[in-house]
From Swiss-Prot:
Coiled coil: none annotated. The gene is gloC. Keywords: Detoxification, Hydrolase, Metal-binding, Zinc. This is Hydroxyacylglutathione hydrolase GloC. It comes from the Bacteria. It holds the Pfam family Lactamase_B. Is inhibited by Cu(2+). The keyword Zinc applies. It comes from Escherichia coli (strain K12). It catalyses: an S-(2-hydroxyacyl)glutathione + H2O = a 2-hydroxy carboxylate + glutathione + H(+); (R)-S-lactoylglutathione + H2O = (R)-lactate + glutathione + H(+). Its EC number is 3.1.2.6. InterPro entries: MBL_Glyoxalase_II, Metallo-B-lactamas, RibonucZ/Hydroxyglut_hydro. Its cofactor is Zn(2+).
Length: 215
């Protein structure tokens, strides 16, 4: 699987354009805003966009999803249904951050633990990793050893858990029980900031040590 990171919104959110090199079929993960910028990247790439994938329901990860889905005529998949209240609350999220109003969004398909997503010859595994939000999912390409982790884990940090229905202990369990076992050599693309590996975070991330700081 190939990827290109497209930073969007004032939150510098890592929207990812991912694709299968053999078929040139592609997906967008977490198009949080700046729809025109994303359209330009997709159109310049020469790829065929097939779907939009969402890790969770926060505005900075989904803000341009509806516009892009309509523009390209593609479905939206994810997150897990527990994040429905976030997607239905997008207008309130917009007002809270002083951004242009974003209408409620209902995906074409909710995702669950164990689901798979096909992009040409690429297969992504879906893992449900609650804690930052209750319906947060991540996408893992086992062959490429590449993980798109949303706001679950960052280089040197983890997602906030002080939002409605966030749970810090659940977040840490998601990381330790579901992500770290994927392997130390797995590279992850976080929702914000630089890439890292699960092995580096296992050893150095202060939130994953025995004495953990808490947001």
């Amino acid at each position: 699987m190939n990827y290109r990171i497209i930073p969007v919104t004032a939150f510098s959110q890592n929207c990812s354009l991912i694709w299968c090199e053999q078929t040139r079929l592609a997906a967008l993960v977490d198009p949080g805003g700046d729809a025109e910028k994303i359209k330009q990247e997709v159109d310049d790439s020469g790829l065929t966009l097939m779907q939009i994938l969402l890790t969770h329901g926060h505005l900075d990860h989904v803000g341009a999803a509806a516009e892009l889905a309509q523009h390209y005529g593609v479905p939206v998949f994810g997150p897990e249904k527990e994040d429905e209240f976030w997607l239905q609350g997008l207008p309130a999220q917009s007002r809270m951050f002083g951004l242009e109003e974003c209408q409620p969004l209902t995906p074409d398909r909710w995702l669950n633990e164990g689901d798979t997503i096909s992009i040409g010859n690429v297969t992504l595994q879906v893992l449900h990793c609650p804690g930052h939000t209750p319906g947060h999912v991540v996408f893992f390409d086992d062959r490429a050893k590449l993980l798109i982790s949303g706001d679950v884990i960052f280089k040197g940090g983890v997602g906030r858990s002080d939002f409605p229905r966030g749970d810090h202990n659940q977040l840490i369990s998601s990381i330790k029980d579901k992500l770290l076992p994927l392997g130390d050599d797995v590279i992850f693309i976080p929702g914000h900031g630089p890439l890292s590996t699960l092995g580096y975070e296992r050893l150095h991330n202060p939130f994953l040590q025995d004495e953990m700081p808490v947001w």
